[in-house]
Amino acid sequence: RYKSDSLSSQVAYSSVYPASWDWGNINNTNFLTKNLNQHIPQYCGSCWAHGAVSALSDRIKIARNAKGLDINLAIQFILNCGVESAGSCNGGDHYAAYEFISDYGSIPFDTCLAYEACSKDSSEKACQSRDYSCKPDNICRTCSTFSYLGGKCKSIDNYPNATIANYGRVSGYKNMQHEIYTNGPIACGINANAILNYKGGILDVPDESTDV
């Protein structure tokens, strides 16, 4: 079980930051967890969950000073159990994802539950043959072998998980800059159209719609 650190800053606020900062390469050490694709194995509008959970996984790695095996958290758990409050493959909210994890009490490691890019309201054909409700074996399970070989799965009651000490909102690029530099990646919603031509620096497109 891993409990995340407080959202509050661990160092004094500074107005001076390096010209660039990449948690993926700090003195040749990668403090980030693996890259993910929300649309594998099929389309799923779960960018909000990927952003929230990836930032949490990264912060755990930063808190552990990149020691030991990476702890990746189960995004599928939020799609199974947070569909009513946080979102689904049809969209959701990253802040609501943190709220759900906090209210539920924990989030399992992804070794409990592989990402399937499905939720119970998915229209993709591949998602129609399985139950994605929030039942014990859709939180953490172990299987004897592959289903096409006749394998059976059962739930695990005591499973590895992470918790959230607290969470909150950060607004304004200076506060975001400070939070990222001090504590690690953050999750945020943006209009993705502007990213198509993004080359670097602060993304500032005042004429673009702010609707997300």
Stretches with model-predicted labels:
Residues 1-212:
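Catalytic-core signature of thiol
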